[in-house]
């Protein structure tokens, strides 16, 4: 408990101190802030203007400091750190290109996903090298075990990449991604503790909770900084790999239900638009706008209302998971 407290407060305090200086630095470097989509909600062109991205740099710095200081660097923790940093580098390049071109598009989606899958597959193969014979097995719920066999490697890679991009899609409102990530880390860390999977993984989760809470202080509406792709892609990958390491990938889908809904809303919207355009010559939409949080914005909901209601949903689903499915 004392060690967990050290990890939490080290990451939180370190982030809380660094963020104000980092925000000032970013505003000097990029006066225009993160490029905003002109096709997005009209209010964002005003409320998101001149807000700098790349807050994920401080999130990672604040998280990794206590991990390196207080957490035992087991192969699992080292793998978590490496995968997180690789995805952070990809996100940093994406953010940099957006700022350089002053356009909301950075790396192409195909390029990002290809690199993500390569990194994830390499990470899972490394995990396989030092894992036990039960490597291909995962827990569904209440002791129900599924053996994926040879399919587990691509499945685990899909979880990591899917989680990374789901957090990225969710990061569209002030405080939305941060609150969802905090909940996911909290309950995945709790599962690791309850199941005695690995106390070091619990400490890893606690470090990120502290760092993201310090970020949330400056990211609540109206946000002073965004986490950027360097934050969302890396944090999402860390969540996905954490669920893989504790063998609770399926439960993570329930805990991170908002991530799932946000991702599905985009897939449904794009698929239906392409289908109707092909069949009728004119594309139609299921939602007013995707991801889902923009749909509710279009219906007149305020950012704070959407963020809080989505957070309530994720907490309820997480408590349900711990109570009835674990």
UniProtKB/Swiss-Prot annotation:
User: Record's Pfam families?
Assistant: Glycos_transf_4 (PF00953)
How does the protein's chain sit in the membrane according to the entry? Multi-pass membrane protein
Q: Which domain of life is it from?
A: Bacteria
**By its UniProt entry, which InterPro entries does this protein fall under?**
Glycosyl_transferase_4 (IPR000715), PNAcMuramoyl-5peptid_Trfase (IPR003524), PNAcMuramoyl-5peptid_Trfase_CS (IPR018480)
Which cysteines bridge via disulfide bonds? Answer: none
Q: Which cofactor does it need?
A: Mg(2+)
The record's annotation in HAMAP family points to: MraY (MF_00038)
Which top EC class is given?
A: transferase
How is this protein named in the record? Phospho-N-acetylmuramoyl-pentapeptide-transferase
Kindly indicate whether the keyword Nucleotide-binding belongs to this entry. no
Q: Which GO terms describe its cellular component?
A: plasma membrane
Principal localization reads membrane
Where is this protein localized, as stated in its record? Answer: Cell membrane
Tell me if Cell inner membrane is a UniProt keyword of this record: no
Q: Which reaction does it catalyse?
A: UDP-N-acetyl-alpha-D-muramoyl-L-alanyl-gamma-D-glutamyl-meso-2,6-diaminopimeloyl-D-alanyl-D-alanine + di-trans,octa-cis-undecaprenyl phosphate = di-trans,octa-cis-undecaprenyl diphospho-N-acetyl-alpha-D-muramoyl-L-alanyl-D-glutamyl-meso-2,6-diaminopimeloyl-D-alanyl-D-alanine + UMP
From what organism does this protein derive?
Wolbachia sp. subsp. Drosophila simulans (strain wRi)
A Gene Ontology biological process in which this protein takes part is: cell wall organization
Q: What does the sequence similarity comment in the record state about its family?
A: Belongs to the glycosyltransferase 4 family. MraY subfamily.
Q: Which residues cross the membrane?
A: 2-22, 51-71, 73-93, 113-133, 143-163, 175-195, 199-219, 225-245, 250-270, 305-325
GO molecular function terms listed in the Swiss-Prot or TrEMBL record: metal ion binding; phospho-N-acetylmuramoyl-pentapeptide-transferase activity; UDP-N-acetylmuramoyl-L-alanyl-D-glutamyl-meso-2,6-diaminopimelyl-D-alanyl-D-alanine:undecaprenyl-phosphate transferase activity
**Gene that this polypeptide is encoded by:** mraY
């Amino acid at each position: 408990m004392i060690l967990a407290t050290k990890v939490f407060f080290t990451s939180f305090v370190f982030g809380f101190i660094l963020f104000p200086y980092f925000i000032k630095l970013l505003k000097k470097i990029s006066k225009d802030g993160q490029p905003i989509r002109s096709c997005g909600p009209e209010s964002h062109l005003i409320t998101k203007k001149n807000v700098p991205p790349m807050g994920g740099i401080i999130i990672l710095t604040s998280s990794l400091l206590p991990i390196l200081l207080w957490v035992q660097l087991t192969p699992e923790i080292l793998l978590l750190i490496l995968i997180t940093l690789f995805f952070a580098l990809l996100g940093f390049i994406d953010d940099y290109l957006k700022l350089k071109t002053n356009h909301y598009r950075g790396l192409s989606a195909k390029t990002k996903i290809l690199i993500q899958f390569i990194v994830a597959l390499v990470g899972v193969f490394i995990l396989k090298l030092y894992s036990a014979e039960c490597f291909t097995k995962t827990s569904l719920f209440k002791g129900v075990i599924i053996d994926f066999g040879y399919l587990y490697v691509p499945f685990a890679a899909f979880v990591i990449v899917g989680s990374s991009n789901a957090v990225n899609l969710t990061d569209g409102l002030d405080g939305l991604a941060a609150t969802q990530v905090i909940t996911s880390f909290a309950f995945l860390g709790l599962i690791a503790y309850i199941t005695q999977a690995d106390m070091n993984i619990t400490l890893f989760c606690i470090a990120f909770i502290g760092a993201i809470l310090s970020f949330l202080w400056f990211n609540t509406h109206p946000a002073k900084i965004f986490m950027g792709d360097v934050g969302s892609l890396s944090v999402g990958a860390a969540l996905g790999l954490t669920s893989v390491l504790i063998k609770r990938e399926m439960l993570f889908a329930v805990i991170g239900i908002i991530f799932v809904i946000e991702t599905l809303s985009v897939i449904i919207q794009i698929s239906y638009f392409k289908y109707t355009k092909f069949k009728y010559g004119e594309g139609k939409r299921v939602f007013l706008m995707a991801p889902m949080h923009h749909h509710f914005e279009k219906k007149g909901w305020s950012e704070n209302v959407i963020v809080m209601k989505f957070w309530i949903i994720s907490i309820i689903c997480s408590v349900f998971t711990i109570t009835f499915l674990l």
